[in-house]
Amino acid sequence: MFHFSIGTVLISICWLAQWMEAKSQRIDPDAENELWDSIKHTKVQNIVEKNAIGEINSPPTDGTPYLKVVCISDTHEQLHNVTVPDGDVLIHAGDFTNNGKREELIKFNEEMTRFPHKYKLVVAGNHELGFDHDENQGERQDADKGLGTEDGYNILTNVTYLQDKGVTIDGVTFFGSSYHPLRGFPFYRNRAEQLAECWKAVPNDTNVLITHTPPLGYLDQFGDERWGCRDLLKTVERIQPAYHIFGHVHEQHGVLSNGNTTFINAAQCNKGNQIQTRPIVFYIPKKTLS
């Protein structure tokens, strides 16, 4: 009969985790499926259920002041077909247009005025052509070449546009960034080197992180492929924001939790860019200075 001490077991677990991490570092960073398979055994993914009106939690009942946050993404020129509940903060995680045309941006900006939310936070998606100064437009798909609006975010006067920027609302820190690993679109950056550097901009005190792309393995599956970013997942696990809001993968609308962070894919459209889901709502306590 073999006898193992608790210390021996803990050492074995730590060794296994280190071995899995070392193994993942040797995998081609573009081999997303293989990469996820090498680390998924160490990840926690609990499904968070929504109620009939899209809420994933309840407001505090002890008198604690709170923000009601409403999350949408990937509306693709169909925002007028979305029933958006009232709240304090409205988040749009990108792809509000189909290709960033000026008329699409004007329409979106005007549509956002009809919502009563005091704060409207927006990040760009890969379909907001012209928003990324550093885009290699020669890599665009043929159908997208010549389209978009350079510096089109300047048209968005009715929202707070976040690109590597943050805002603090009643003590709650929000930070937004649009980078993703899908080649041929604005805000594309290659996996590992460039994206790892991009995510260093996320402050350690971020409470609500808003990106367009999902992190690897969390509501990121498109067909047989994983579209998420490993380095983004590392960043989320390091800073542990209370919420991570994103979209990009239409088929994966939903909510997961790893125990520290709630991951929300707020995509509204299906593959045919028709609205098929409702916004997701959460409540977060305000923070007061002591």
From Swiss-Prot:
It holds the Pfam family Metallophos. GO terms for molecular function: hydrolase activity. Glycans are attached at N204. Keywords: Glycoprotein, Signal. CDD domains: MPP_239FB. InterPro entries: Calcineurin-like_Pesterase, Calcineurin-like_PHP_ApaH, Metallo-depent_PP-like, UPF0046_metallophosphoest. Residues 1-22 form the signal peptide. The keyword Signal applies. Belongs to the UPF0046 family. This is UPF0046 protein K07C11.7. It comes from Caenorhabditis elegans.
